[in-house]
Amino acid sequence: MASKSGKTGSSGRFGARYGRVSRRRVAEIESEMNEDHACPNCGEDRVDRQGTGIWQCSYCDYKFTGGSYKPETPGGKTVRRSIRAALSEDEE
């Protein structure tokens, strides 16, 4: 008798279609998307995705734009860091 394999995750809905690498990428993206994200306004881990690039905190109802699958993109982090560095140089 066949033994039951492990859980397939969110990409298990595709079955054997689309290839292993594509299904794995979808599973990674969806797991990151559904993690707890901190609100940039209040700091609570209650941010939910409303649509493509639209995120909303369910605690303070702060709505903001971000990446399609993450509230903050790597490029956005870089820009924020460079703005902070420029502001700290002006203060000195």
Curated annotation (Swiss-Prot):
Annotated positions binding Zn(2+): 39, 42, 57, 60
Cofactor details (free text): Binds 1 zinc ion per subunit.
Cofactor(s) for this UniProt protein: Zn(2+)
Record GO biological process: translation
Entry superkingdom: Archaea
Zinc finger region(s), C4-type: 39-60
An example molecular function term from Gene Ontology annotations: large ribosomal subunit rRNA binding
GO cellular component: ribonucleoprotein complex; ribosome
PANTHER family associated with the record: 60S RIBOSOMAL PROTEIN L37A, LARGE RIBOSOMAL SUBUNIT PROTEIN EL43
Subunit structure: Part of the 50S ribosomal subunit. Contacts protein L2.
The family this protein is said to belong to: Belongs to the eukaryotic ribosomal protein eL43 family. Putative zinc-binding subfamily.
Protein task: Binds to the 23S rRNA.
Protein name per Swiss-Prot or TrEMBL: Large ribosomal subunit protein eL43
Species assigned in the record: Haloarcula marismortui (strain ATCC 43049 / DSM 3752 / JCM 8966 / VKM B-1809) (Halobacterium marismortui)
Upper classification of the organism: Archaea, Methanobacteriati, Methanobacteriota, Stenosarchaea group, Halobacteria
Gene transcribed to yield this protein: rpl37ae
